[in-house]
Amino acid sequence: MAISTMLGSISCCPSPKGYEMVKQHSVRLKHCVFTVKSSVPVYSEGVNDGIKLHSFGNLVKKKVFLDTSKRFYFQGRWSESSGRRVETYAGVDVASAVDVINDLGFDTLTFLMVTVIIVPAFRILKASPILGFFFAGVVLNQFGLIRNLTDVKVLSEWGILFLLFEMGLELSLARLKALAKFAFGMGLTQVLLCTAAFTAFELPPNGAIGTKILEFLFHSRPDLVNIRSIDEAVVIGAALSLSSSAFVLQLLAEKGELPTRFGSATLGILLLQDIAVVPLLVILPVLESQDIGGESIWPMLAKESAKALGGLGILSLGGKFFLRRIFEVVAETRSSEAFVALCLLTVAGTSLVTQWLGFSDTLGAFLAGALLAETNFRTQIEADIRPFRGLLLGLFFVTTGTSIDMEVLFREWPNVLSLLGGLIVIKTLIITAIGPRVGLTIQESVRVGFLLSQGGEFAFVVFSLANRLGVLPNELNKLLIIVVVLSMALTPYLNQLGRKAADFLDERLDPGEKIGEDVNFDVSESIVIIGFGQMGQVLANFLSTPLVSDSDLVGWPYIGFDLNPAVVKESRKLGFPILYGDGSRPSVLQSAGVSSPKAIMIMYKGKKRTTEAVQRLRLAFPGSPIYARAQDLPHLLELKKAGATDAILENAETSLQLGSKLLTGFGVMSDDVSFLSKVFRDSMEIQAQEEITASETNAGLKPMQMKASDINVVSAATQKQVQLMKPMQMKASDSNSDSAAEILQETAGLSQPPEIDDSSVNIDNGFVGKADKAQD
């Protein structure tokens, strides 16, 4: 087995793992002989027992042998021009691969133990587990519990790749086009303005404004954060303009806000920032090079960017035509192992290709997800990668916490806090100012500004490269990394602060002036529809028909509210009475003239947003019925507890409607189909009430069994219906003689329903309660 080691790691002090201390036998030797040269000595075990030594600098005499303890010994003589001689011996222990594996195994066990403790604890505290992982990284690093940090960091970066891949899977082509507006209209402007602002703050060189402020406030050393050149200022400014995709996207996913316009704007900006890393990585070597003289860097930058964009386009087209076909072929084998392996290969392969093109690997992972977003395999792919994504992303947050140099933090904490505050304030103000120009409300702009005001993980890449090329001094590099890491840790709190600021602005602004005066009827007791998307418009049309009201009016009077200006504008063109504003806030409803709504229909899709709206409106209007959309049974129970009068399991009603059409197509009478649908809906409400009473949130379905005993005379249509519904077992053993007559009456179209066993009713989906009449 070939064995190699870098002797440059050896120093005349306690050595790293796997090496002994260099032994000096002469006080006349000023430096360790084996680290004077930058060349890397390499040992390799040959065919025989002999060992060859390469690139060993100025050694005149070389002698190497291998003993039975698998330890390399070497002896060298170094002759100086003065004729002095020194002789040095060193022993190097070869770190075996087993040691590396053991270290990774120990680190893995440590991380899994931390995950088991942190995630439940922070869920109980109702805090984001991201913070728990971050502080765990700080603690583990301080106590030296992570043995192989370099390899762990490499492994943790896969978590970001899986996160971006999953985000790509959630995007359709239409949503990608919508994101382009935010990416280029808002993201590009944000990167340019933030870079310019931070650069101006760091100029002029050797006397920057920021340096003078820190000296005045905290008496900091002039050389601590002093900028030496314009190039250095541009690099720092551009790196600080980036935000953290990993922290922000994970937070939005936890809150269920990715599908919202606020989430789309945030995602669009983050995608543009990923693309912006490319010119940064191209410019840095150019800035460091001393050979370009007065030549412009723009031709080189344009050339590299064009090459990268062309390669990205080829990758997109190739993936569109070949990637889907590959998944089809593997899926036909029905091998779960091969399918999971293909998912991992797709993420890794596209990431490597985009890295080779000059883009970030995360952009490649996102692109792969977007290419598979509209295939039939999306659901299975998400299910397969979710465990990998969750654990590896947690590992990334742990390794982020290990990046803090605690010695520098404690020594320079006033400067750290000042730089941290300046970073958050400048980015928040710039992003908030840009938002309304691309169609966001001031409230949404404030939220996006706070959420993206932290630094990003790509700043580590830029700072590291700049430091390695000599563009950024080491002390300033450590300080900036601390600032970026702390800002990333504050992301959950920045999100909460942005939400509170948006709420404050929403209450301070006069909603009556915002939403206009286009409603020409009394809305004080009208039905309120909150969220006027497609479902809201269908409901509005349903309420407008004369058949739903026995008065002289054309249907029931209603008023709609929506925060999307485009939706409001288009709906008004179609004649809908809709106002601009957040209808989930009582102050907005009261300003619009709604004092005692006849009913409130909440058409939001997000779970958390819907529940919060129900809670606020129930407190403000205790006598008004409130109806809402539930995503699943636990959400329905949560809405009921929050004060909703009734709720709809929207996905289940679709299943019931499709099932009804299926049975009708099989020839089942429409009355029988309607009866069956009613049984399901009523049984769902019964179990929901039982779940609420028992305070349970079990989303599973109980097997539904209908009992009908001693049926001696049943119509032909009923017999046919029973034959078609094999999953519903009809029992005829446990009922009295009246049951047959009741079933016969219902089959003949009478109103008396049959008895059903409440304890065995299957309820997963469908309308609950009185909302079954409001079909979407």
From Swiss-Prot:
Pfam families reported in the protein's UniProt record: Na_H_Exchanger, TrkA_N
Reactions listed under catalytic activity: K(+)(in) + H(+)(out) = K(+)(out) + H(+)(in)
One GO BP annotation of this record: potassium ion transport
Record keywords, A-Z: Antiport, Chloroplast, Golgi apparatus, Ion transport, Membrane, Plastid, Potassium, Potassium transport, Thylakoid, Transit peptide, Transmembrane, Transmembrane helix, Transport
Topology with respect to the bilayer: Multi-pass membrane protein
Knockout mutant characteristics: No visible phenotype. Impaired rapid hyperosmotic-induced Ca(2+) responses in kea3. Altered non-photochemical quenching (NPQ) and photosystem II (PSII) quantum efficiency after transitions from high to low light leading to a reduced growth rate. Transiently increased NPQ upon transition from dark to low light. Slightly faster NPQ induction on transition from low to high light. Delayed NPQ relax on transition from high to low light. In contrast to dpgr, the mutant kea3 has a high-NPQ phenotype during steady state in ambient air.
Region (Disordered) residue spans: 728-776
Subcellular location: Plastid, Chloroplast membrane; Golgi apparatus membrane; Plastid, Chloroplast thylakoid membrane
Bilayer-crossing regions: 94-114, 116-136, 154-174, 182-202, 233-253, 267-287, 297-317, 339-359, 390-410, 416-436, 446-466, 469-489, 527-547
SUPFAM superfamilies associated with the record: NAD(P)-binding Rossmann-fold domains
GO MF annotation terms: antiporter activity
Keyword Ion transport on entry: yes
PROSITE patterns, per the entry: RCK_N
pH dependence: Optimum pH is 5.8.
Cellular component GO terms held in the UniProt record: chloroplast; chloroplast membrane; chloroplast thylakoid membrane; Golgi membrane; thylakoid membrane
Interval spanned by the transit peptide: 1-72
UniProt record similarity statement: Belongs to the monovalent cation:proton antiporter 2 (CPA2) transporter (TC 2.A.37) family. KEA (TC 2.A.37.1) subfamily.
The name this protein goes by in its record: K(+) efflux antiporter 3, chloroplastic
Organism whose genome encodes this protein: Arabidopsis thaliana (Mouse-ear cress)
